[in-house]
Amino acid sequence: MAGQKIRIRLKSYDHEVIDQSAKKIVETVTNAGATVVGPVPLPTEKNVFCVIRSPHMYKDSREHFEMRTHKRLIDIVDPTPKAVDSLMHIDLPADVNIEIKL
């Protein structure tokens, strides 16, 4: 697979879980003999929701909720077949979203 690059994007609501998953991916791929660039932290997406506390009136009383999406980027340069095979069999937590592009 000379001249190719695999780009992995990780998304999660918990920054500790995403860092552990990125570390696990980097360790597995480097043990398989490929070179890794990253993990690169991408900007955190922050969604804020404003909700009126009362069901009928008191519009001045509001509550704010926020949801943060943490993102990481990992590039695998010139992946070996062993590295690709180890990526296919890696076990990651369920709350981490993974996008892989070739």
Swiss-Prot record:
SUPFAM superfamilies: Ribosomal protein S10. GO terms for molecular function: structural constituent of ribosome; tRNA binding. GO terms for cellular component: ribonucleoprotein complex; ribosome. SMART domains: Ribosomal_S10. InterPro entries: Ribosomal_uS10, Ribosomal_uS10_CS, Ribosomal_uS10_dom, Ribosomal_uS10_dom_sf. One of its GO terms (biological process) is translation. Keywords: Ribonucleoprotein, Ribosomal protein. PANTHER family: 30S RIBOSOMAL PROTEIN S10 FAMILY MEMBER (PTHR11700). Part of the 30S ribosomal subunit. Belongs to the universal ribosomal protein uS10 family. Involved in the binding of tRNA to the ribosomes. This is Small ribosomal subunit protein uS10. It comes from Bifidobacterium longum subsp. infantis (strain ATCC 15697 / DSM 20088 / JCM 1222 / NCTC 11817 / S12).
